[in-house]
Amino acid sequence: MVMKQTKQTNILAGAAVIKVLEAWGVDHLYGIPGGSINSIMDALSAERDRIHYIQVRHEEVGAMAAAADAKLTGKIGVCFGSAGPGGTHLMNGLYDAREDHVPVLALIGQFGTTGMNMDTFQEMNENPIYADVADYNVTAVNAATLPHVIDEAIRRAYAHQGVAVVQIPVDLPWQQIPAEDWYASANSYQTPLLPEPDVQAVTRLTQTLLAAERPLIYYGIGARKAGKELEQLSKTLKIPLMSTYPAKGIVADRYPAYLGSANRVAQKPANEALAQADVVLFVGNNYPFAEVSKAFKNTRYFLQIDIDPAKLGKRHKTDIAVLADAQKTLAAILAQVSERESTPWWQANLANVKNWRAYLASLEDKQEGPLQAYQVLRAVNKIAEPDAIYSIDVGDINLNANRHLKLTPSNRHITSNLFATMGVGIPGAIAAKLNYPERQVFNLAGDGGASMTMQDLATQVQYHLPVINVVFTNCQYGFIKDEQEDTNQNDFIGVEFNDIDFSKIADGVHMQAFRVNKIEQLPDVFEQAKAIAQHEPVLIDAVITGDRPLPAEKLRLDSATSSAADIEAFKQRYEAQDLQPLSTYLKQFGLDDLQHQIGQGGF
């Protein structure tokens, strides 16, 4: 008897690649077509109803937007570039993803297999280019295994919370492979279970907190799900809270015992308290300036909670470490304590925060004088929805947004945290609106950062992404100019540039826009922008002064360390006549100033 043979069905390898992406929940990706990536473009065209191609105007924007996808959602972001320059243009965004530990997949075009290693047009050995940025970096060598390679790349990106790069010779996706041979492992992928907090370690940590005279809780984005526990522990034990800048908003900015963040992108109360604390509890924190700033020189006990064993003891010698989830560990601490009476340390910090916030409000509420960033950010706060998302570029805008944006746990904000590449504002806003179309999205950028990716305002228009873009124009790289003031011996160099009228740039890509240079213009213009952004993107170009924001890391307020003339000059320059140092409130509540004691080098 002759068995009837079933006819084998085939599928294009490129179609299988797209189906693997779909299986992992990818619903859009970014890039620019090229001859070496056209086979993937062909497959995308066939699946356009299920996965959307977003055409950016520079591959860098695609990679930055993919990184922003991952930062906002936790899901993998995907971008692509053609062989040679298309792929290398992705690098800034890929490094941003690597440094902020988020999963991104980059597909790189390559000349067909018959022309590889022949010095053909735009053909080169691409693997070494991506060796540093990627946790997984391979070139596909045959069509049959191509879907598996893509699946493996995604699993590795998730597992390592980093970048995966796959170079794809252009002929492979057009080849037929057996339809039953490809699969995606998305439905079987699992994240590791987080360790439970060790009871004895939690007890020791709790006892140390209770014995402290000047305790401080310093949390990072690893505590993103523990906002309620952080605030409750702070209230119960009367411990002030401070965060890294990326963790802003985990606890509402309005919380009276929230001090802000430290170092330079900082708020004054945080820097001052950190220098005085005797016990610091690090929660999900990888503060990158600990070693260079000597932030913990008066710290007697350093405590740490983290899910990553590599982080324990990384930034400071740690006395008690708990390898566990932040939320569970904080809940375990709360279970061991009861509410304490107010302490002098607690009262001094509350008073210092109140004084600092009054200073910030005095800048924001000015009704006359030249337009400054502070009044513009007040206008942003006025029209912001409770769950607004902010994509913030890099530079002085980080420092000012850190101080003047009023965030709660309902908000999200993203920037390039550790890599700190300029130009991320526009790409991040594109990603935010694609992922959360129902939420209000702001792009906040200085003119330096905005000029790096301004061509992709056109992408917002093309895909009808109603972003409110606010550009802070002062014709300088302000953050670097301020550094030069502190470090250089000679005049400023390379930090000032000619004006760009961003309202005209926006008009050129068919986006409604405004240009303002007076405080009194802000209310009406921002209300108009909010109305426009119900349906389409809009841009406000705010021409502001080049004033340096108050340097919280270089305070001249305390008579123990600064002359009366220096203090007066500092207050005049930064409009800070009523601003007081923490030492004023320490003295008021009967505490010594450890920071300024002669010979004080720790406990």
UniProtKB/Swiss-Prot annotation:
Query: Where does the record place the region Core?
Result: 1-191
Record's function text = Important for the aerobic growth. Decarboxylates pyruvate in four steps. The energy released is partially stored in acetyl phosphate.
Lineage of this protein's species?
Answer: Bacteria, Bacillati, Bacillota, Bacilli, Lactobacillales
Co-factor note (free text): Binds 1 FAD per subunit.
The positions annotated for binding Mg(2+) are D447, N474, Q476
Give the quaternary structure.
Homotetramer.
PROSITE patterns reported for this sequence: TPP_ENZYMES
Q: Which cofactor does it need?
A: FAD; Mg(2+); thiamine diphosphate
Q: Give the protein name, as stated in the record.
A: Pyruvate oxidase
- Specify the species: Lactiplantibacillus plantarum (strain ATCC BAA-793 / NCIMB 8826 / WCFS1)
Q: List the disulfide bonds.
A: none
Q: Which reaction does it catalyse?
A: pyruvate + phosphate + O2 + H(+) = acetyl phosphate + H2O2 + CO2
**Which domain of life does this protein belong to?**
Bacteria
Family note: Belongs to the TPP enzyme family.
Region named Thiamine pyrophosphate binding? 343-603
Q: Record's InterPro entries?
A: DHS-like_NAD/FAD-binding_dom, POXB-like, Pyruvate_oxidase, THDP-binding, Thiamin_PyroP_enz_cen_dom, Thiamin_PyroP_enz_TPP-bd_dom, TPP-bd_CS, TPP_enzyme_TPP-bd
Q: What is known of its domains?
A: Each monomer is divided into three domains, each of which contains a six-stranded parallel beta sheet surrounded by alpha helices.
Q: Which Pfam families match?
A: TPP_enzyme_C, TPP_enzyme_M, TPP_enzyme_N
Q: What EC number(s) does its UniProt record assign? A: 1.2.3.3
Keyword line? FAD, Flavoprotein, Magnesium, Metal-binding, Oxidoreductase, Thiamine pyrophosphate
